[in-house]
Design a protein with these regions (language model features):
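Acyl-donor binding region in acyl/amide transferases
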Residues: 93-176, 180-182
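Alpha-solenoid HEAT/Armadillo repeat architecture
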Residues: 143, 224-229, 233-237
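Accessory, usually C-terminal, subdomains that scaffold auxiliary metal cofactors
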Residues: 168-230
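C-terminal/domain-terminus segments
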Residues: 8-38, 129-145, 209-221
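Short, surface-exposed beta-strand/loop "edge" segments at domain boundaries and coil↔beta transitions
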Residues: 71-73, 159-160, 197-200
Length: 238
């Protein structure tokens, strides 16, 4: 297994954060998917089906956070491009319940991508690895790919974090931007960042860190994570 649900970490000495086009690295896609499903099952979600179609979609890019030897997967996220081979995950999840979702998406000033598939193993819960570092890297990647806008379907927890990156509730969709998502048995928040290049309304520190990655996609940075200093090896490729 490439994830650990029993041994929470207080500190990791080093991690790797890299990106790739899904169709170019099936092995890493499988590790990403295995870890994500393992976490969902650990929290009691009943999985009657799952799709692997995104692995074969040229419009999907993956951010994976892992050990530097690639033996342990800690978390990650995906970017899926609107208008590629697949409908977006948000369309599959709530499209039947939000009748004007497709109209809203097609009215965007593309290219538009969905930030989705965000997860982290329980082993690194509380360290921000699967949330802050994953979102930061995905937004940096989106800018390098030339995307203009991003949307994201957020849980209550990720919605609170999303404000740091300039995502705002789309009040014209659902119930003022919220919809009860039976798959997670909670309300989901439909959010939108209209300018990921300039990161409108984002936190100044996060904007600086994202632009630093964009300017230096292959980068090593030492940061305090948890109880100690972690060496972060970025390799953000398009």
């Amino acid at each position: 297994m490439s994830y650990n649900i029993n041994s929470p970490e207080k500190h990791l000495s080093e991690i790797s954060i890299r990106s790739f086009r899904a169709v170019d690295d099936l092995e890493s896609c499988m590790r990403f998917r295995e870890g994500h499903l393992g976490v969902l099952e650990a929290f009691g979600f009943k999985l009657t089906s799952s799709t692997e179609d995104w692995m074969f979609d040229p419009g999907t890019h993956v951010v994976i956070i892992e050990s530097t030897d690639r033996k342990i997967t800690y978390g990650g996220s995906r970017l899926q491009l609107l208008g590629s081979k697949l409908e977006l995950p948000i369309q599959s999840a709530i499209g039947e319940d939000v009748s004007n979702l497709d109209e809203y998406l097609t009215s965007r000033k593309g290219p538009v991508a969905e930030l989705c598939g965000l997860w982290n193993s329980v082993a690194v819960a509380g360290l921000g690895i699967g949330s802050v570092y994953s979102i930061r890297s995905a937004i940096a990647l989106g800018g390098l790919l030339g995307y203009n806008e991003m949307i994201a379907l957020c849980s209550a927890f990720t919605y609170r974090i999303s404000h740091k990156y300039g995502f705002r509730l789309v009040e014209s969709l659902g119930e003022g931007g919220k919809i009860f998502y039976a798959g997670a048995n909670q309300y989901a928040h439909i959010t939108h960042q209209p300018d990921i290049l300039n990161l409108i309304d984002s936190d100044e520190i996060e904007r600086f860190k994202i632009n630093e990655i964009r300017l230096n996609p292959v980068l090593r940075i030492d940061e305090i994570i948890g109880d100690g200093l972690t060496s972060i090896h970025y390799q953000i490729e398009t």
